[in-house]
Amino acid sequence: MKCLNNSDIEKELQRLGRTYLTGDLKNFTDLNYIKTSGLEIGISKYEEFKYDKAHLHKWNNEYNYVLEGEIKVYIFSEAKEYHFKKGDLFNIEPNMAYMTKSIAGTDILFVKSPGGNDKSLIDISDNNQFLEWTKSWEEKMI
């Protein structure tokens, strides 16, 4: 049997704000994660308001379950903002460009399948509306 204990998970979340619990990881982590292929599971913890840079995943389906707090997700291809709260689940499909912002106290459990580092950043530096959206929770996309 393989397992991870809460104190090790919490220590890594305090250090980085995000940790992978399972996967075949290439990036450095102090957590002795459970090595798997075909699936990655992790947690993101946002102690304060934060936005994640615009990006897409080339081949991963990403499922996100809101454990605590709230998150807004902007999907570029739909030109639409979604608002998710505690208990909500949402799926980001492969090649779906998006950006997120979370209020303080938000925790997300994420699952990526089939796994692997496929993140590709999207440059929004020339779009003032997108940049303004990332600065505050209240800012809405028109």
Which residue ranges define each predicted feature?
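A short, N-terminal "cap"/entry segment at the start of jelly-roll beta-barrel domains
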Residues: 1-45, 51-54, 126, 132-142
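Short histidine-centered beta-strand/loop micro-motifs
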Residues: 31-34, 43, 52-58, 75, ...
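A generic structural signal for short beta-strands and their flanking turns/coil linkers
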Residues: 37-42, 52, 61-62, 67-69, ...
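Conserved hydrophobic/aromatic beta-strand scaffold that supports enzyme active sites
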Residues: 41-45, 63, 81, 89-91
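Histidine-centered metal-chelating micro-motifs
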Residues: 51-53, 72, 80, 89-90, ...
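A short beta-strand-loop-beta hairpin characteristic of the jelly-roll/cupin
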Residues: 60-86, 119-123
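A short, sequence-level motif marking secondary-structure junctions
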Residues: 86-91, 127
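Ligand-binding loop in jelly-roll beta-barrel domains
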Residues: 94-121
